[in-house]
Amino acid sequence: MEHSRFLSCLILAALLSQVNPRILKVLEPEDKVMLECNSSITLLQGTEGQEVSGNNKTRDLGKRIQDPRGMYRCGENTQQLILQVYYRMCQNCVELDTATLAGMIITDIIATVLLALGVYCFAGHETGRFSRAADTQALMGNDQLYQPLRERNDAQYSRLGDKWARNK
């Protein structure tokens, strides 16, 4: 039992001796992105941002929606921490994996089949049967373009043209 405690204390001491005293944190207050270090922050590449405190220990990288990104160094000597920040705020993105793609293809096929079935049902069959008499038409003679109107004297305006002779 004592050997396991001694071994665990030895492992803990070995790990703690490797800890770097510089701490580089990424803070996200509200909709902003900020870097905080216990020593100075140096920009290697990317979004520069603005110093929040005058001692260069806190840097405001801007809003998350503006996709801040870059590489930053905490410290100035050989024992330094480098942090790469990369934000990607995608408002209109859809993750297209195999399940989503298969679902889109299957729903497209189902919609096409239903549309074809609907067109077949409505346009493929006649709505009713007509009698044979309705298929034949009373045809006029070849010389006649228009069928003459019948004589009627039952309306108010039928007597207006009594003085003029009608061609019969």
UniProtKB/Swiss-Prot annotation:
It comes from the Eukaryota. Residues 1-21 form the signal peptide. Residues 22-102 are extracellular. It holds the Pfam family ITAM. GO terms for molecular function: transmembrane signaling receptor activity. The keyword Protease does not apply. Its main location: membrane. CD3D is mostly present on T-lymphocytes with its TCR-CD3 partners. Present also in fetal NK-cells. One of its GO terms (cellular component) is alpha-beta T cell receptor complex. It is found in: Cell membrane. GO terms for biological process: adaptive immune response; cell surface receptor signaling pathway; positive thymic T cell selection. Residues 135-163 form the ITAM domain. Glycans are attached at N38, N56. Disulfide bonds join C37-C74. The keyword Cell membrane applies. It is a single-pass type I membrane protein. InterPro entries: CD3_esu/gsu/dsu (IPR015484), Ig-like_dom_sf (IPR036179), Ig-like_fold (IPR013783), Ig_4 (IPR032052), Phos_immunorcpt_sig_ITAM (IPR003110). The modification Phosphotyrosine is found at Y146, Y157. PROSITE patterns: ITAM_1. Phosphorylated on Tyr residues after T-cell receptor triggering by LCK in association with CD4/CD8. Gene3D superfamilies: Immunoglobulins, YojJ-like. Keywords: Adaptive immunity, Cell membrane, Disulfide bond, Glycoprotein, Immunity, Membrane, Phosphoprotein, Receptor, Signal, Transmembrane, Transmembrane helix. The chain crosses the membrane at residues 103-123. Residues 124-168 are cytoplasmic. The TCR-CD3 complex is composed of a CD3D/CD3E and a CD3G/CD3E heterodimers that preferentially associate with TCRalpha and TCRbeta, respectively, to form TCRalpha/CD3E/CD3G and TCRbeta/CD3G/CD3E trimers. In turn, the hexamer interacts with CD3Z homodimer to form the TCR-CD3 complex. Alternatively, TCRalpha and TCRbeta can be replaced by TCRgamma and TCRdelta. Interacts with coreceptors CD4 and CD8. This is T-cell surface glycoprotein CD3 delta chain. It comes from Bos taurus (Bovine). The gene is CD3D.
